[in-house]
Curated annotation (Swiss-Prot):
GO terms for cellular component: cytosol. Pfam families: GidB (PF02527). Specifically methylates the N7 position of guanine in position 527 of 16S rRNA. CDD domains: AdoMet_MTases. This is Ribosomal RNA small subunit methyltransferase G. The gene is rsmG. S-adenosyl-L-methionine binds at residues 73, 78, 124-125, 139. It comes from the Bacteria. The keyword Metal-binding does not apply. GO terms for molecular function: rRNA (guanine-N7-)-methyltransferase activity.
Length: 207
């Protein structure tokens, strides 16, 4: 698996240390094993996980600004855990309402010795934002409107929303509330992944 991961990273132009590659491969191995009992992801093949979960997460890293992030609806830790591995100086709160997912996240934290993640079982509307976050990340929300509505209390004054989407969501962008605007849309290149991927970066317009 390490060889395939190295080839994918090279194709994507991403440079990581051997330790980071080992951690990413170990995470995929854990996800594959736990998935059989916990049904954490519909992706069953570890090689496919490398593309659809690992690469698809870490291509976002260059666009993140700040040190404190929250991954809302993280599920089995996506994109939060891969991002935490490639950005060791940043901290990621991994938020999910389902206990079995959070148990898996805590086991990953323990086995991989990841000190820059905090798994939390909570609904997003009940989770306090003290202190506020530099970035709110998610690939779980059905729409951008849902994301800013449910998570509006989480980012700080200069914080951003980072939404991972497939095709460019023009209708969703057009229907954003007036107090939010799109700062940029980045087309993401994920080797061996079919279909388009975009990162939509949203800021609050409040003064």
């Amino acid at each position: 698996m390490l060889n395939k991961l190295s080839r994918l990273l090279a194709d994507a132009g991403i440079s990581l240390t051997d330790h980071q590659k080992t951690l990413l491969a170990a995470y995929v191995d854990m996800l594959h094993k736990w998935n059989k009992a916990y049904n954490l992801t519909s992706v069953r093949d570890p090689n496919e996980m490398l593309v659809r979960h690992i690469l698809d997460s870490i291509v976002v890293a260059p666009y993140l600004q700040g040190q404190r992030f929250i991954d809302v609806g993280t599920g089995p830790g996506l994109p939060g855990i891969p991002l935490a591995i490639v950005l060791p100086d940043a901290h990621f709160t991994l938020l999910d309402s389902l206990g079995k997912r959070v148990r898996f996240l805590r086991q990953v934290q323990h086995e991989l010795k990841l000190e820059n993640i905090t798994p939390v079982q909570s609904r997003v509307e009940a989770y306090p934002s003290e202190p506020p976050f530099d970035g709110v990340i998610s690939r779980a929300f059905a729409s951008l409107n849902d994301m800013v509505s449910w998570c509006h209390h989480l980012p700080g004054e200069k914080g951003r929303f980072y939404a991972l989407k497939g095709q460019l969501p023009g209708d969703e962008i057009a229907s954003l509330p007036d107090n939010f605007s799109v700062e940029s849309v980045e087309k993401l290149r994920v080797p061996q992944l079919e279909g388009e991927r975009h990162l939509v970066i949203i800021k609050s317009n409040k003064v």
